[in-house]
Amino acid sequence: MAIYGIGTDIVQVSRVAAVMTRTNGRFAEKVLGPDELRVYHARHARSAARGLAFLATRFSAKEAFSKAIGLGMHWPMTWRALQTLNKPSGEPMVVASGELAEWLDARGITARVTISDERDYAVSFVIAETAQAGAADIAE
C-alpha cells in the first residue's frame, strides 16, 4: 500500500454547539449520515454533552478525510456520503456511499481514521492509502 494522502482536523466543540443553536439542531442532519445520525440521537438523549462531542468528532473526521483525498468538501465528497462508524471493537472506520464510494473504488483508495475528543476540542487524523502504482498521479 502507498500513502495517497493524509489529513487532520481539529474543531472547537463550542463552535459546533453555537452552530447547533443557530440552526435549531439542523446542522446535525446536514452533516451526519443516516447511521451516524442514529448514534447521535441516542447519545444526545443520554447526555447533551456526549451528543455534541460525537457530532464534533464526526465533523472533524469528514474534514480530515476530505483533506486526505485531496478534494476538500467538493463533489463527490459530501457531508453525508462519508460516515465514521465503529467496529464492534470500538475502532473507528470510514464508510463511503454513493458517488464518493465509486470515486474511491476507481482509485483503489482505502482509509484509516483516528478520532479523539476532550471537553473543548475534537481532533481527527486520516491516512488514505492506495494499492495502485503512481498514486500521486491519480489525485489530479
From Swiss-Prot:
Enzyme class: transferase
Keyword annotations: Cytoplasm, Fatty acid biosynthesis, Fatty acid metabolism, Lipid biosynthesis, Lipid metabolism, Magnesium, Metal-binding, Transferase
Cofactor: Mg(2+)
EC number in record: 2.7.8.7
UniProt name for this protein: Holo-[acyl-carrier-protein] synthase
Binding-site residues for Mg(2+), renumbered to this chain: D9, E63
Originating organism: Paraburkholderia phytofirmans (strain DSM 17436 / LMG 22146 / PsJN) (Burkholderia phytofirmans)
Entry similarity comment: Belongs to the P-Pant transferase superfamily. AcpS family.
